[in-house]
Amino acid sequence: MVIVTKGAYVHEFPRTAEWNAFAQILSREHGYIVSDTALEGAAKPYYVVNSSGFYGPPGLDGLISTLDRELQYYSKLLYEIKGLGVMSDENVFGTQYDGNLTARVSRLERRLNPMSNIGSSSRPWSEHKSAVKKADLERYVYANFADWSNHLGPAGKSTREVVKYLMYRMGYYSDTSGIGHDLNYKHFRDHLDIYNLTCSPPFLVSSAVVDGHYARDKFVSFQGVCGFNPMFPDVNGLKSSWSLGRQLDDIRSQKKEVSGTNQEPNYYYDGDTLKPIGSGASVVGERRPGWR
């Protein structure tokens, strides 16, 4: 199935009942062009093409299953981290931002060549992995997503944690050590809550993560493709994120006994500081579906 809108931003996804149903909703309610035959026989079943970024099936399970199946392909991640550049037409960011966005993507392609030619490749990631230095990719992703963190509230630390997790899913890490001792697939899946997928790249972060313990019951997707220019973040907002980051570092250095085990307590964020949650206590504030 192919979903085509104005623009040339391409995502590859498997043919599943959930994705097919979502495609029909887009076609019926939003007027997108849906074709079921254009890519028959292709290496991947169908593409989602949308100049505004990422569209996925409604609900958490569809996104997580997509990540689970597709993250072994480097082309998927390349599209995601290149999204800031390939979506830089006047209908999305405005022409004044195009040069900056394009330049950043070009620098990535030059530095990490030969990856620049595999954005539309259906070859598996294993064929390209040996040519890429893990540290180079980490530095690029961290640098770009740090620009977004102030628009998500206190999310700077969790941005790094989730990027590491996604790279672990691709095989960059043999296990989750160094990522956060509880930040594994089930934990990730069970505690995410999806807000707005339209006009956003498909990266999700929590408001704050303390070594895998989720500090607040609010999870957001990266907003901004249609709402603001992430290349020029607000300085005061970044200062707030850095302040919370220091709190997270302090908390990690002060391990406490919880339920008789030597592990860190869970924390919630009250809008100002992180506060510990006692054994058996619940998160203060609204608890959204998906929390367990």
Swiss-Prot record:
Role summary: May be involved in transmission by vector nematode species.
Descriptive protein name: 32 kDa protein
Species this protein is from: Tobacco rattle virus (isolate PpK20)
